[in-house]
Design a protein with these regions (language model features):
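Bacterial N-terminal signal peptides
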Residues: 1-6
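Intrinsic disorder/low-complexity segments in short proteins, especially the signal peptide
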Residues: 8-10
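Hydrophobic small-molecule pocket/channel-lining residues, especially in calycin-type beta-barrels
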Residues: 12-172
């Protein structure tokens, strides 16, 4: 009886999130130095894959001391990627998917102290030279989008594919 239970599909481990849409944002994985268009250091970012490839976790440290993190995941039910960002000053909740080779996510930014919320969108574009451009916009006036952040990611160290719990990952 115990042998039958151990082999049943209900007791099998999770299949993980591999292939296709689950890997559409993999170009963002890695350790990065982030600079603005004029070359000013904006900060450092690390994006890792966790939980059998089902989650991308971002850890941001700005050059001025600010920090934040995001959880990024693909939902196959609505065929959309979602990012939930949390920092001491703001929360961002955006969703979408690949559009012409770029990851485009749209939703809202909430400024915590002011308790204000505005439409927000982010576009991540892999560039031919191996960098990634991250361009954020916000709309405080109906239909008028203004740049919020424009950063260029350059790899700073080896690319971490995953941590423990990811498909094929070795324990830490």
């Amino acid at each position: 009886m115990a042998l039958l239970l151990a082999a049943s599909p209900a007791n099998a481990g999770p299949a993980g999130c591999e292939g296709g849409a689950y890997q559409a944002f993999d170009f963002w994985l890695g350790r990065w130095e982030v600079r603005t268009a004029d070359g000013t250091l904006a900060g450092h970012n690390e994006i890792i894959r966790e939980h059998a490839g089902c989650l991308l976790v971002e850890h941001w440290q700005s050059a001025t001391g600010g920090a934040g993190s995001s959880l990024n995941f693909y939902n196959p039910v609505d065929d959309r990627w979602r990012q939930v960002w949390v920092s001491p000053g703001s929360n961002i909740d955006i969703g979408g998917g690949l559009r012409d080779g770029s990851m485009v996510l749209e939703g809202f930014i909430t400024y915590l102290e002011a308790a204000e919320r505005y439409p927000f969108r982010g576009t991540w574009t892999p560039l031919d030279d191996g960098r990634v451009r991250q361009f954020f916009e916000e709309s405080r006036e109906s239909g008028v989008w203004k740049p919020w952040f424009d950063g260029f990611y350059s790899r700073s160290e080896s690319r971490p594919e995953s941590r423990a719990g990811a498909a094929g990952a070795a324990p830490d």
